[in-house]
Curated annotation (Swiss-Prot):
The protein, known as: High osmolarity signaling protein SHO1
Membrane side Extracellular: residue ranges: 58-75, 128-135
Keywords: Cell membrane, Glycoprotein, Membrane, SH3 domain, Stress response, Transmembrane, Transmembrane helix
GO cellular component, one term: plasma membrane
Organism encoding this protein: Podospora anserina (strain S / ATCC MYA-4624 / DSM 980 / FGSC 10383)
Lineage: Eukaryota, Fungi, Dikarya, Ascomycota, Pezizomycotina
Location of the SH3 domain: 258-317
PROSITE patterns in alphabetical order: SH3
Compartment annotation: Cell membrane
Any one of the GO BP annotations: regulation of actin filament polymerization
């Protein structure tokens, strides 16, 4: 059995290729035009910012004089909200266009939270005025606040969340092979796995009497196993890939007989031609799954083809 650090492992080559492509991302309008959610929300945000900017500009120029007991001066902190949202919307545009959402989503959510506070404060200072320009600026800030709330929910949710996975299923740009390799084939780089299990069940037989090896690495065996005449349990390639570790693809895996789970593909996947155990599938295709532990699931297609599939391309039904 080749060790886990073998340079000939297809999985390690995937990881290395993912690291190389990670630094080559360029801005592409196709990532926005091909994503209806990003196109709609960014367009509304830019339009709302333009309304807020010109409304605030005319309200600041044409502000009426103060009367006794009434302060009619324009709230200057509104300009800080306008400037902040300009860079915020541009930043979201750049992140989505460069397909770097999984890299910067935490920072985006933090900035969106600050922007929501600023926009609601600006609305409070403008909405109660009877001046048309201030009301227009307040309307723009309200639209920005609404888009911000939607963005916080989207960017703050895991890619495996049902609402976000449903929204991402309409994005055509996420179908490119470059995005699939960068986001998912790096075993932890990009979209997280949909299963929280990190270790498959241990193999136990009555003949071993509790002396089986609990370690996933074959070279680290317990003293009881070394002193026993019974050979260690066989660990297949499937068990290694279930733990997210690259394994050997020398032999085929005997498929299980039961597939109690059903999963839907949220991305298309092309099997590695050097690994006979992987299976290809198309977006929105329904697969039957036998085991949902680990990053690789044993799956069966409707035509009867069986193999292993990356769990972060699938969502359980």
């Amino acid at each position: 059995m080749p060790n886990y650090g073998s340079l000939h492992s297809p999985s390690l080559r995937k990881m290395e290729q993912s690291r190389i492509q990670y630094g080559r991302k360029r801005l592409s309008l196709g990532n926005i035009i091909g994503d209806p959610f990003a196109l709609a929300t960014i367009s509304i945000a830019f339009l709302a910012w333009i309304i807020s900017f010109f409304g605030s500009l005319f309200a600041h120029i044409n502000q009426p004089p103060n009367t006794p007991g009434v302060n009619n001066s324009f709230p200057l902190y509104t300009w800080w909200a306008v400037v902040f949202y300009f860079f915020l919307v541009v930043g979201v545009f750049i992140v989505v266009a460069s397909d770097s959402v999984q890299t910067y989503h935490v920072a985006i959510v933090g900035y969106l939270g600050c922007g929501l506070v600023l926009s609601t404060s600006a609305v409070h200072g403008l909405i109660y005025s009877n001046i048309g320009s201030r009301e227009a600026a307040a309307a723009g800030m309200i639209l920005l606040a609404m888009v911000t709330i939607v963005w916080i929910f989207y960017f703050g949710s895991a890619p495996s969340a049902v609402p976000r996975a449903y929204i991402d299923s309409f994005a055509l740009a996420k179908e490119s092979s470059t995005n699939r390799q960068t986001m998912n084939t790096g075993y932890g780089i990009g979209r997280p796995e949909t299963s929280t299990s990190v270790q498959p069940p241990q193999m136990y037989t009555a003949q071993l009497n509790g002396l089986e090896n609990p370690s996933p690495v074959g070279g680290m065996q317990s003293s009881g196993m070394r002193n026993s005449a019974v050979p260690p349990p066989f660990q297949s390639t499937l068990g290694q890939k279930s733990n997210g570790l690259p394994g050997s693809s020398d032999g085929d895996i005997a498929p299980p007989t039961e597939y109690p789970y059903r999963a839907k593909a949220i991305y298309s996947y092309e099997a590695n031609p050097e690994d006979a155990n992987e299976i290809s599938f198309q977006k929105h295709e329904i697969l039957e799954v036998s085991d949902v532990s680990g990053r690789w699931w044993q799956a069966r297609k409707e035509n009867g083809d069986t193999g292993i599939a990356p769990s972060n391309y699938l969502i359980l039904l």
